[in-house]
Amino acid sequence: MQKKSATAGRAQRTEESRRRILEATLELAAEKGYEGTAIAQVAKRSGLPVGSVYWHFENKDKLFAALLQHSLDEWEGRQDWLFRSEEPPSRQLEKMISGRTFEAAEATNFWRLGLLLALERRLSGSAAREMFLEIRRSRLDLISGWWQQALPPEVTSHDPGFPLRLAQFTMAAADGLYVSTSAGEDWDATALTGMLVDSIWHLVRQAALQAGVRYDPDLTEN
């Protein structure tokens, strides 16, 4: 019994150390970026020995890859913008585009870090960059599937590639809104979200007309 209790205690301390390391890394990454963050700084910020950081994570690249996955899991746990059948597509799309923009800064630091990694071609092949790109590919598939369900079947039959293009456009709109409003300038994020959503629905209605059907995104079923 005592042996089991001791084992459970070690596991709890190990998980707590890992959490502290990841939290410290996220804080430093928000301040200094990937290149400016060092393992020694992470150890100091977390209050743990450098050896403890290396025990959990082989190197900085793998540490950042684990950070991105951990942060994504936490962020997704707070999201409810996909596949809620009681809400019309118009409301779901609005949440998809504006979700990151209206969250607290600490909740979206990993998106900022991920975008910086994606833009940094010198890091091509690194575990952290590849992790974020895989996250984006997975999210693109998820949103493409959402569009596949939201669109009338006549539209997808008429243009099978339309859901994927809409998913790419949706992600581009969300990225652009997030980057623009994160720059610290006085941009009206709410108004811009509405304009982006209206633009996308205009494209959808045009595609529906070409397919010979009518479509209303404010209805849960069409």
Language-model features: locations:
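Hydrophobic alpha-helical bundle segments that form small-molecule/ligand-binding pockets
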Residues: 86-87, 125-126, 137-166, 170, ...
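Short coil/turn segments at alpha/beta junctions that flank glycine-rich nucleotide-binding fingerprints
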Residues: 31-35, 85-86, 107
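Helix-loop "lid/cap" segments that line or gate small-molecule binding pockets
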Residues: 82, 98-105, 114-123
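Helix-turn-helix
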Residues: 20, 24-62, 66
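Short Lys/Arg-rich basic patches
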Residues: 6-11
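Amphipathic alpha-helical packing segments from all-alpha helical-bundle domains
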Residues: 73-81, 91-95, 106-109, 126-153, ...
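Generic hydrophobic, amphipathic alpha-helix propensity
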Residues: 14-25, 42, 67-75, 143
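Short, intrinsically disordered or compositionally biased N-terminal tails of bacterial proteins
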Residues: 1-4
